[in-house]
Amino acid sequence: MKTTEKNVKKDTKKKVKVIKVRTVRMSEDKPESVNKEIIDNPVAEEKVPERKPEVSKTEEKKILENKLDKTKKAMKRTEDIGAVGEDELNELIKDEDVVIDDANNMFINKKTGTLVKYIGTTSAIIIPDSITTIGRYAFRGNETLKKIILPDSVKRIEKFAFCHCFALEEIVFSNNLESIGENAFLKCQRLKELNFPPSLKAIGKGAFGRCSSVEKLLLPAYLQKISDLSFFSCRRLRKIVISGSVESIGFSAFSECYNLKKVIISNSVAVIGESAFSWCRSLEEITVPSTVKTVSNWAFYGCQNLTDLKISYHTRDIKEDAFCGCENLFNVHIIEFDNEDVSMDEIKKGRKQVIKILKQVNRKRAESYAREYGISTLFI
């Protein structure tokens, strides 16, 4: 199937703004009966589906509150787990291989090269070269630490390692860092910059949740997955560049990033997870690349300022309410358009106006359709 494009002058007499017209040449591999039916009956494909009853404002508000509550409960569970970590930490300190490094105010497991616990009160520290792992809960709740430098010997940061370090403003990562554990930097509210090394391959669930001062995020080249809640409620985050190895974006990964305006998604992503970008109220446009096969439930829920969506016809699996609450989403561009049906049902949900992708209809009929449904911009 091949398509040709014609530019159409704006019709000043009509209120409908027709941006682009595509004419479709029928594919030779289509059954003759199908081609004949469309040729003989050119209006067959312009049937307007029955409009589904709109959800009331009260019902929509209740749905939104339920989704938000689900995300907050998930985050609360991770914080509760961190709160009971002291007992586990005490057991680690009792290990016979753990010694006290008085010079650096640390408990260190010499056998594994793990920094088990930091007990100092300085505002800036450099981790010794002998350390390969920052242990779980090692700096949890430290109230004085503002800056930390990790040597290139460090390959792992375990779960809750720096969570609730409310004074932490800067961390220099090891150039050989491979993984960051669950909730490792949870609620480090003054942490401003995240300069990840190229070696980083895994970021755990909730790792940077509620790091509310981070403004820009460039994810490393070899990261394969953005885990659930990884950057949840990073409220000053404005820009995200998702690198070329990421295959999936997890549940609520960027939910409640209220100031997020720009997201660049690489051509490696196949799944945008449930609530992944929900409540990103400042997001104005998004391009879903052709590699994405699934846009999950509530993926862009409540993105109230989203006006432009570019999405490939290859993206066939758009889940329930994926774009619900995007009440200003008026312009939908279908990339790599062909003669196959493109379901718009989930994109239309919860919006004040309907954008419909029409095929094989003339301009006059398209304008008539647009006037009937109050469409300000129509792509055909």
Task: Name each model-derived stretch.
Residues 1-62, 72:
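Charge-dense, low-complexity intrinsically disordered segments
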Residues 64-67:
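Intrinsically disordered, low-complexity cytosolic tails and juxtamembrane linkers
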Residues 71-110, 119-133, 143-156, 166-179, ...:
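Structural signature of tandem-repeat unit edges
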Residues 113-115:
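Hydrophobic residues embedded in beta-strands of well-ordered beta-sheets
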Residues 136-138, 159-161, 182-184, 204-207, ...:
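Consensus positions within tandem repeat domains that build extended binding/scaffold surfaces
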Residues 347-348:
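A structural signal for leucine-rich repeat
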